[in-house]
């Protein structure tokens, strides 16, 4: 119950358009942490991280809130992907629409769950919406996780979308503008 109240309070703060704290955040590092956390929670699951080359995935934002975005997407994928099916997290460079286009970091979380109908996909970011009401009751989902993702990504001047079809799983994609100096920084070699 406490988590639900916290989620509702966060959405209320975002509705009031309170500014978020912005500092340099390494999106790749957050993604790697989320994958590692998911592997600990679900050690029998295959969870892969793939990374595009060419830029440091440095964005300006609130690290704790961006960590929550990725955590919500990972929790959603773990909840809806059957055992034995992989989950893939990809981080790569892209461009947001605009004039001129804005260089951005793209993070995708792909699951192999039941997928969504077009009507469900159009509503999946609504507050309290659950595509599968029975599953929500079983897993205890509030229907706020993806609404929080959308609100937080929007507050970071980013976009969120879903590509899905029934029986085909889903890919949730967030794009966040790169920090001005991200293009000049080469990512660290592992």
Show where each model-derived region lies.
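Conserved catalytic submotifs in the C-terminal HATPase_c
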Residues: 23-24, 48-57, 92-94
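Short beta-strand/loop element within the Bergerat-fold HATPase_c
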Residues: 84-102
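Short conserved segment of the HATPase_c
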Residues: 104, 116-128
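Conserved micro-motifs of the catalytic ATP-binding
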Residues: 16-21, 58-61
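Conserved glycine-rich
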Residues: 157-158
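Short helix-loop "hinge" at the ATP-lid/N-box region of the Bergerat-fold HATPase_c
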Residues: 77-78
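A conserved beta-strand-to-alpha-helix junction within the catalytic ATP-binding
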Residues: 21-36
